[in-house]
């Protein structure tokens, strides 16, 4: 999901489909792959954190994400304008020149936020609602 690359997605789905029978027979041996299968079926909740990593406000946003259990979470962070390697960070500007968080599902994002409390609310709502399929 970080790159939104259809070729990577095709390969991942092929790997999951190829191992479907063994995953059914021996689920405890495939914990990570079962998590990937869940993400493929139900979609991901994506969080983009944009800002200077060392700042206290950026760390507060990181802490808000880290303190919530969100199944199928995809997280990316970094400074604005340096998103060539991570498509999730594309077109995600700072709001009022402050570190900004974007919570997205199925290529649609909640309103961008700059404070940890509002980000926590968005993450709680996202975890309750679950993700939507992106395929």
Regions found by a protein language model. Give the residues of each.
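Aromatic (Trp/Tyr) and acidic
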Residues: 1-135
